[in-house]
Amino acid sequence: MSDKPGMAEIEKFDKSKLKKTETQEKNPLSSKETIEQERQAGES
């Protein structure tokens, strides 16, 4: 009935088969400086 893998299956899982991937921010947050500059540009 359950779709969850059994404990035995989890224990035999080989982490070395996983590939290391570099995480890349798709939408990095602006720095405080950038936000301040944009605010001042918007006010003038």
Swiss-Prot record:
PANTHER family reported in the protein's UniProt record: THYMOSIN BETA, THYMOSIN BETA-4, Y-CHROMOSOMAL
This protein's GO CC annotations: cytoplasm; cytoskeleton; cytosol; nucleus
Chain segments annotated as coiled-coil in the UniProt record: none
Protein name: Thymosin beta-4, Y-chromosomal
InterPro entries: Beta-thymosin (IPR001152), Beta-thymosin_sf (IPR038386)
Described purpose of this protein according to its UniProt entry: Plays an important role in the organization of the cytoskeleton. Binds to and sequesters actin monomers (G actin) and therefore inhibits actin polymerization.
Tissue: Ubiquitous.
Domain of life, per lineage: Eukaryota
Chain segments carrying region Disordered: 1-44
GO molecular function per UniProt: actin monomer binding
Main location: cytoplasm
GO process terms (BP): actin filament organization; regulation of actin polymerization or depolymerization; regulation of cell migration
